[in-house]
Amino acid sequence: MSSRIILISCVSKKLNYKTEAEKLYISPLFKYNLRYAKSLKPDKIFVLSAKYGLVGLKQRIEPYDLTLNKMSLAEIKKWSNQVVKKLSKVANLKKDEFTFLAGQKYRQYLIPEINNYKIPLKGLGIGKQLGYLKNKVANEEKCSQLHRYFNSLKRLKFPFLDKNIPKNGIYILFEKKELAHEGNRIVRIGTHTGLNQLRSRLKQHFIQENKDRSIFRKNIGRCFLNKQKDSFLEKWELDLTAKKDKEKNSQLIDFKKQKKIEQKVSKYIQDNFSFVVFPIEDKKKRLALESKIISTISLCNECKPSKNWFGFNSPKGKIKESGLWLVNELYKEPLSDKDIKELKNI
């Protein structure tokens, strides 16, 4: 199993006394880099110090007046070789995934020694780096607020009663063993387009064994089949809703097998998912709010699926990447502060 490691470059603005590395550097850029790095929930975070090389966050170091920006190429190469030597003792340079929150001079001779890496701030000036990091950190706080709020609402699960569900609104799904923001992790957000159809929509997911009426059911079935490398996955993809498609494809499908998969999907959903609901009467407002909630959660680096999350068996890259049982409305416009305030007042 590979590890996720983040490397943050040091800065000139420091405290004037010996302390832990994560506290020594006091510039806004370093502080936001560190907050962002921690939000990613990596396995390890290190500081790239111009004087001390590779430094752990809790390592106590003295302040110093040294930067790679004033070093010659030969000095930078020597420094980089020392960092690589240290790094190779605490990480697998060929298998681990590295994220650089560091300038060009700090990373240029490290990158050739590493196979897997990301540079999210590449090409950005200091001002734009701060803007990027502030947005990331702010979105994580919004996502945390959403999780705290939705985790506080009355939780429903199968079997559920119509009287506990509004006719029009939005549902928020949670999945067993999935955690985020000190609570249950949100794994799906959904609504309906037809008038008074929220109850019906939830029944299509939880009860009615017809994957062509529920993309959520179809995605759960895809995971079962893909995990088993079952060739029936190709037939599972066929949609028999339209009359012409039913006439064309029915003879291709083993309906006894399909029924067994539908039953398996029902059991998995009923046993593993719970949800909360809240009313939104206006269709346009429902759809807009659904989209913004999805985007807010998909943009949050703290909302990571567990290592054994069932969704990792999906053939859909967007599901595996986002950690959500969704492929639409990901990474778009998140909720504003005003949106969150209004949401809590519904």
Residue ranges and their predicted role:
Residues 1, 138-264, 269-346:
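GIY-YIG nuclease catalytic motif and its immediate N-terminal context
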Residues 1-141:
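Peripheral peptide segments
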